[in-house]
Regions:
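Alpha-helical junction/boundary sensor with strong preference for TPR arrays
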Residues: 43-44, 80-81, 116-117, 153-154, ...
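Partner-binding and oligomerization surfaces adjacent to conserved cores of proteins
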Residues: 274-277, 281-283, 289-719
Length: 719
């Protein structure tokens, strides 16, 4: 430890400089500050003074006194010593950035010249400049800064980071070839972690270019020792690539390389879910159950489904599994069509919209309310009533869950929905229509995360970083939020006649959206074809009754023929083997849920009718759980005009995510995603038009086109 042999006032300036630097190396910052601050410009040469101020700034910074550090470094002039000046400017740039003063940081870093500074100082300055420009959403300037960094000048880590960042900037700018070229420059010996990130990006780029083999080769370059989390992400991608090639064994091997202790819980669960899905599709339910069990904290439905199926008598397991597979196919058909249904509307009170947007700077969370509060008394019961009409008297619907929904519609500016919903003080047409972008919802529809597992003691979870299922930490006194949910369209069914249709956009909306009639007609034609395909799939997997000659045809909502001039026609829906039916012969070989349930419960020779009471109960429990995702997606035909789609959360009443207020009769859960960033536009009913300017303040900041629209529907509110 350094100890001076004489007082500071008896030392030369050089001795005080040496002493201060020595104190700095020993982290004795107070003493370093005292020694270095005693050196005045007029008593020493410029280089010595610059060195003292550089060290003084470091001592202040290490002591947490950033303002004094900035003052010290600012005392150094380029004419004192160009290399020390460059180091000081680098430090200043970092200090300003830490203080949130980006423009001053840019000014400091930009003052460092390649020809005057040490190479590592110049390259670090360019790296920092690029990061600031990136954060300012100035990709061209960021690319220019990072492109200034040469391998021969920079240390390997700085060069690798610059090349990785460059690749990301190119990829985000749509310059995929340049991204590939740039990421390919990063070597493993430069920085293993950054190399792994570059290889991960390379694989994604190759995959996007339709080069799966090159993507697989690239992701395979990433080692667990490089970074366990990046390795896990690469293995997740590898598994998906192999799965797309139907190489099930390689996919399972890749996903099995992801270890629970090395990654975040959701990544591990996703890998195990994928493994379970392969085994389930192959009919290996025991191994599927094992994998799903590992994923149940995030993807409970599949685990619960397989578990219940395996608890049933072996002679009915295959049929129950067929019901499960049909359910999956139906849910795929109920998903939105991104190219045509990328925006959906939610009708609400204007006052509620203001709280969601955060006009008080503290936005509230979007809510899913209990199903018991909706205006449809048949919610969750329509399928039950339909099964009863088919002669199935057993109770195969569930009524002991806590179900929460939030409803959306393809009708963005609907007179009737303005009259029914979002009413202020009970007055019609006083609400607003919030039009959401598709990014508000989950883009991973295969996991059915909206069905939660049995409630656990969340007090134990709070000891584990108080994290919820989305990985988002909440305060001690806050309820957990539900993560992004998949948006599903509803099926509208008349349980007495069996007549049904899917929620969908109206033809008129295409003419509102597209000015040119030919464009609107073309888009409508493509959309109509997509919806027809979805309807055929739902018919095949849910409603098809098979070869009943007495019920050879049924009437459906509209004709799938080629006459576009007729808006509503009769669609002949074959329930047998008519080759002219739009449902293919191959699809007719598939036993629908209706057919399977009918055979189980109405055929006296079916194994179900030979089971004892306990076994029958297990079978009923399995069927109820399998069909649970569909129970609240089938609505009564009377509500068809609403063209509804919805997100759901189905859980137990003990779930601690549930908010309740008995006096106000409130029960709801809160959604994780903020509302304001996902709003495409807002339609104001006539009664809410007075709030137009207030909504514009919140929604139109920085945008050239207003997101706030006044409804064009004719309506006169009776006072």
């Amino acid at each position: 430890m350094t100890e001076p042999n004489k007082p500071l006032d008896q030392m030369t300036a050089q001795e005080r400089l040496d002493l201060g630097i020595s104190y700095l190396g020993e982290s004795r910052f107070d003493k370093a500050i005292k020694a270095l601050s005693s050196i005045r410009r007029e008593e020493v040469n410029p280089e010595t003074y610059a060195g003292a101020q550089l060290g003084l700034g470091v001592a202040y910074a290490e002591s947490g006194e950033l303002k004094q550090a900035i003052e010290a470094w600012s005392n150094i002039r380029r004419s004192d010593d160009s290399k020390i000046y460059a180091q000081a400017q680098l430090n200043l740039g970092a200090a300003y950035a830490k203080s949130g003063k980006r423009e001053q940081s840019i000014e400091a870093l930009s003052s460092i010249r390649r020809e005057e500074a040490a190479p590592e100082i110049y390259t670090q300055a360019q790296l920092g400049l690029g990061l600031i420009y990136r954060d300012q959403d100035k990709p061209d300037q960021a690319i220019e800064a990072w492109s200034n960094i040469r391998r021969e000048e920079a240390d390997p880590e700085t060069y690798a980071e610059a090349q990785f960042n460059l690749g990301v900037a190119y990829a985000e700018s749509g310059k995929r070839e340049q991204a590939i070229k740039t990421w390919s420059k990063v070597r493993h010996e430069d920085d293993p972690k950054v190399y792994a990130l570059a290889q991960l990006g390379l694989g994604v780029a190759y995959h996007a270019q339709g080069e799966p083999e090159q993507a697989i080769k690239t992701w395979s370059n990433i080692r667990r020792s490089d970074d366990s989390k990046i390795y896990a992400e690469a293995q997740l991608n590898l598994g998906a690539a192999y799965h797309a090639q139907e190489d099930w064994e390689q996919a399972i091997e890749a996903w099995s390389n992801i270890h629970r202790e090395e990654v975040d819980p959701e990544t591990y669960a996703r890998a195990q879910f994928n493994i379970g899905k392969i085994y389930e599709d192959k009919g290996d339910l025991e191994r599927a159950k094992e994998a799903y069990c590992n994923a149940q904290d995030f993807f409970y439905y599949n685990y619960g489904r397989v578990k219940r199926i395996l608890e049933c008598p072996p002679k009915v397991i295959e049929k129950l599994h067929d019901i499960a597979k049909n359910t999956d196919e139906i849910l795929k058909s109920l998903q939105i069509i991104p190219d045509f249904e990328s925006r959906v509307a939610h009708y609400s009170r204007a006052s509620t919209a203001f709280t969601l947007f955060g006009d008080d700077k503290n936005p509230s969370n979007f809510r899913l309310s209990t199903i018991r509060g909706v205006n449809d008394p048949t919610e969750g019961l329509v399928l039950r009533d339909y099964w009863e009409q088919q002669g199935i008297s057993e109770t195969i619907h569930t009524n002991d869950t806590a179900t929460f929904v939030s409803c959306f519609t393809f009708n963005h500016d609907s007179l009737n929905q303005f009259r029914l919903y979002g009413k202020e003080d009970g007055r019609e047409a006083t609400g607003v229509s919030l039009v959401f972008k598709k990014e508000f919802f989950s883009d991973q529809p295969d996991t059915l995360g909206f069905i939660a597992g049995p409630s656990t003691d969340l007090s134990s979870k709070s000891e584990q970083n108080k994290s919820n299922e989305t990985g988002k930490t909440e305060g001690d006194n806050k309820k957990q939020l539900i993560g992004k949910s998949t948006l599903y369209r509803c099926i509208y069914l008349d349980p007495e006649t069996g007549y049904w249709t899917l929620a969908q956009r109206d033809k008129s909306t295409f003419y509102r959206e597209h000015n040119e009639e030919a464009d609107a007609r073309g888009k409508w034609g493509k959309y109509y074809k997509s919806i027809s395909t979805k309807e055929d799939d739902v018919e095949t997997h849910l409603f098809n009754k098979g070869n009943n000659e007495e019920e050879d045809v049924e009437t459906h909502l509209f004709n799938k023929g080629n006459n576009e001039e007729e808006d509503v026609e009769t669609h002949l829906l074959n329930t047998g083997n008519n080759d002219n039916n739009s449902v293919s012969n191959e699809n007719n070989k598939i036993k629908s849920i209706s057919q399977i349930l009918n055979s189980i419960f109405t055929d006296k020779n079916h194994p179900y009718n030979k089971c004892n009471k306990y076994e029958k109960q297990k079978i009923l429990e399995a069927i109820r759980f399998i069909l649970l995702p569909l129970q609240y997606l089938v609505k009564h035909i009377a509500f068809q005009e609403e063209q509804e789609c919805r997100i759901m959360y189905i859980t137990q009443f003990r779930d601690e995510k549930i908010h309740s207020d008995r006096e106000k009769q409130w029960m709801y859960v809160e959604y994780e995603e903020p509302v304001l960033p996902h709003i495409d536009k807002i339609w104001l009913s006539p009664g809410a038009a007075k709030d137009q300017d207030f909504f514009r303040i919140l929604l139109d900041q920085g945008s050239g086109k207003s997101k706030v629209r006044i409804s064009q529907n004719p309506f006169r509110n009776k006072e």
